[in-house]
Design a protein with these regions (language model features):
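Extracellular/periplasmic periplasmic-binding protein-like sensory domains
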Residues: 1-65, 76, 132-167
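Residue-level signal for nonpolar/aromatic packing positions in well-ordered secondary structure
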Residues: 42, 66-70, 118
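Segments of small-molecule ligand-sensing domains
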Residues: 49-60, 71-140
C-alpha cells in the first residue's frame, strides 16, 4: 500500500526484493486492459479534490470493487433497494472487474473471492512510479487462495474458536 511505502521509498530506505506478499491492485501493470486509464482517473481524484496526486493503494482498490459489487447487486434487485434486499443480492451476485472474472462473496463467510497477486516488491525501472511495484510470482483466484469452509471449521475447532456458518442464517 502506497501509504505505507512511499516515505521509505522516497528516503531510499525501502527493502526492495525482501518484501513478499499479496497485492490486490496491480496498478503498475499497464498490460491489463484498462488498468492505466483506471489508475490515471484515480490519481485525478486527488488532484481535483485534494490538490495533490493520490498514489494507488489497497483502499482505492477496495472502493472500486466494493462500489462495483453494490452496483451489480442493485441491478438484480432494482425494484427493492432496501438493506435486506441489497444484502441478499450481494450474497448471490457474480461480476467481473479489470482484474478478474467471476468475483463474488462466499456464502459461508461473506469474503469476496477475487484475484490475489503474490509479489515481491521491487523498484520500478520505468521511472513511472516512486513507490515499490511488484514482481508477480503468481496470480491466484479466490477459490485457490482462500481457505475452504471445512478448513476454517477445522482451524476454529483446533484453536477453540467458534465458527459461524453465515449461509445458515
Amino acid at each position: 500500500d502506497s501509504t505505507n511505502t512511499q516515505s521509505l521509498a522516497e528516503a531510499g530506505n525501502y527493502p526492495y526484493g525482501k518484501v513478499h506478499g499479496v497485492d490486490l491492485w496491480p496498478f503498475w501493470m499497464d498490460e491489463i486492459d484498462g488498468n492505466a486509464e483506471f489508475v490515471q482517473r484515480y490519481s485525478e481524484i486527488g488532484k481535483e479534490y485534494f490538490d495533490k496526486d493520490i498514489l494507488p493503494s489497497d483502499m482505492g482498490y477496495t472502493w472500486y470493487v466494493g462500489i462495483k459489487a453494490i452496483c451489480e447487486a442493485a441491478k438484480t434487485t432494482a425494484d427493492d433497494l432496501s438493506p435486506e434486499a441489497m444484502t441478499n443480492a450481494l450474497s448471490t451476485v457474480h461480476f467481473s472487474t479489470l482484474y478478474g472474472d467471476d468475483l463474488y462473496f462466499r456464502d459461508f463467510d461473506h469474503t469476496m473471492a477475487h484475484a490475489y497477486y503474490y509479489v515481491t516488491a521491487v523498484e520500478d525501472t520505468t521511472g513511472k512510479w516512486s513507490i515499490p511495484v511488484g514482481d508477480v510470482y503468481a496470480v491466484y483466484e479466490g477459490d485457490e487462495m482462500l481457505p475452504t469452509k471445512e478448513e476454517m471449521e477445522e482451524y476454529a475447532s483446533k484453536n477453540n474458536y467458534t465458527f459461524t456458518d453465515l449461509s445458515a442464517k
